[in-house]
Structure formats: structure tokens, C-alpha cells
Amino acid sequence: MENRERAGAGAVGSAGSLGLRVGQAVFSSASLLFMSVGVEFFSYTAFCFLVTIMGLVIPWSCTLAMIDVYSILVGCPLRVPGVMVIVVIGDWVLAILSLAAASSSAAVIDLLLQFHGSHCSPRFCGRYQLSAMMAFLSWFLTAASSLFNLWFIASR
């Protein structure tokens, strides 16, 4: 029984999963907010990509957080193998896309800062840096969630 509880610690339907999903939603929302505050982000494809991916992560995380809340309240965690595979694949795809978006945005920000602010005002570049940092944190939580759920599937 103890191994099953450990295997399901971060799997869908557990309190650990709820914490991961809330963290994903918070960091993705913060990344989207910091990027969208400046209207200039439309000029760079990497920033548009980041906004698009964070816009996908937010509803995915919120939906799975609602499933986690329901599973915790009812006391019956969602352990259907087919659904777990879909969650793992969705997390995996979003984790890869989040990493790509955060990395490309960070690279563009670094390039803009190389020009000593001639292409990006310090106020906007600071916001873009915060947005990329929040996207990296969201990616980390999404990847962790994917690994926890994959571990649960493999342990069954």
C-alpha cells in the first residue's frame, strides 16, 4: 500500500498534482501577463510563440486542477490508464513547447539586451525577462507533472 501511495504522490487526483497544476496556472498566467503588458511583443515571433503556448498551458492546467479538486473531494482518484496516458502525452507536449518558447524568448531578450536597449527599453526588457523566467518555472512544473504521471503508469 505504501508503494502505491508513493507512486501516486503527484499523479492526477492527488494533492501533489493539484499543487503542481495550480503552480503551472499561476506561473503561466504571470508569464502571459508580463509579456502582454508591453504592446511591443508582437514585433518578435518568439514572444508571440510564448504567449500562444502559455495561453494553451493555462486552460490545460486549470482543467486538470478542477479534476484534481473533484477527485480529492470525492475521495476517488482518477486512475483510468487511458486517461492517464492522455494526461502524460498532453503534459509532455506542453512541456516541450513551453521549454522551446521560454528558451527562444530568453535568447531574443539576451540579443535585445546586447544592443544596450536601443531596440528594447529597459522597462519592457525587464518585463520580458520576468515573463521568460515564469515560463521556465511553468515548464519545470509541467515536466515534473508529466514524470510523476508516467511513473504512476509504469508502476501499475
From Swiss-Prot:
Domain of life from the UniProt record: Eukaryota
Protein's membrane topology: Multi-pass membrane protein
Gene Ontology CC: membrane; plasma membrane
Pfam families: CASP_dom
Subcellular location: Cell membrane
Keywords, sorted A to Z: Cell membrane, Membrane, Transmembrane, Transmembrane helix
Principal subcellular localization: membrane
Extracellular face of the membrane: 43-46, 103-132
Spans within the Cytoplasmic topological domain: 1-21, 68-81, 154-156
TM helices/strands, residue ranges: 22-42, 47-67, 82-102, 133-153
Family that this chain belongs to: Belongs to the Casparian strip membrane proteins (CASP) family.
Subunit structure: Homodimer and heterodimers.
Protein known as: CASP-like protein 5C1
Organism of origin: Oryza sativa subsp. japonica
